[in-house]
Amino acid sequence: MTASAHDSHSGTGSSALATIDWRGRPIRIEHQWIAPERTAAPLVVFLHEGLGSVAMWKDFPTQLCNAGGFRGLVFSRPAYGRSTPRDADETWDVDFMHRQAHEVLPALFDVLGIREQPWLFGHSDGGSISLLYAAHAPDCVAGLVVLAPHLFVEDLTITNIEAAREAYLNTDLPKKLGRYHDDADSAFWGWNRIWLHPPFRQWNIEAELDAIRCPVLAVQGVDDEYGTLQQIRGIASRVHRTQLLELPDCGHSPHKDQPQQVIDATVSFINQWRQP
């Protein structure tokens, strides 16, 4: 895989496009820098959920980076946000998160000139991709903050993804998602169909976590509608330097339900482990 510069550091507040070569074609990647002038500060890279994008994070990444004095990079994966949409006939395979971690993320870092060890902040699918990246390239990451990541597929997850499918077909959910994606169908059906694909029920990344060497802060809401606490507890059982934060009165999106607790815990965690 190769990567080529289409745009680069764009400053705070506006998104830009970078181009990588993936799956044999050029793919635009929407991205936005936060406080790039903080050149000596830790870099936090934000990886969104299965239906997320740059815009869907809203101002949370900026709030977090300002609280900790960090730099930030927010981006939309292929098929999401302003990034290149998924072709209508393109289906994702069971290894779709592995490909994001092993192929897309390194290519994006290359085209943007990221040579340091970033901190990855991933939510849901983005949390799983963060874990897979750290397992695949353990020397290339400083640490992980993962919110409601998936290690394996649970009945609870499938039930609520089936409910999301019905909502997309029968409510104004497509219109709502259209505010955050150039092609809402690209974002929704790529995610929904692979999660409901019967072979995906066997997807499990627990054994791969043994290769992770960096510290991990794993956060999950007690009321998470897409997974049980066995997901983050599974990380702690395999990764030595794991801190768990189990939040009451919190669902699948801790950064929305309990933003200040997530910000405080993340700033403390990064400051604890950052290199002087």
Task: Label each PLM-derived region with a short phrase.
Residues 34-87:
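Conserved HGGG/HGGXW glycine-rich cap/lid loop of the alpha/beta-hydrolase fold
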Residues 223-227:
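Acidic catalytic loop of the alpha/beta-hydrolase fold
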Residues 237-253:
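Catalytic histidine neighborhood in serine/cysteine hydrolases
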Residues 212, 218-220:
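Short beta-strand/loop motif that positions the catalytic acidic residue
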Residues 24-35:
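A short loop-to-beta-strand scaffold at the N-terminal edge of the catalytic core in hydrolase folds
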Residues 74-117:
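Active-site loop/oxyanion-hole signature of alpha/beta-hydrolase fold enzymes
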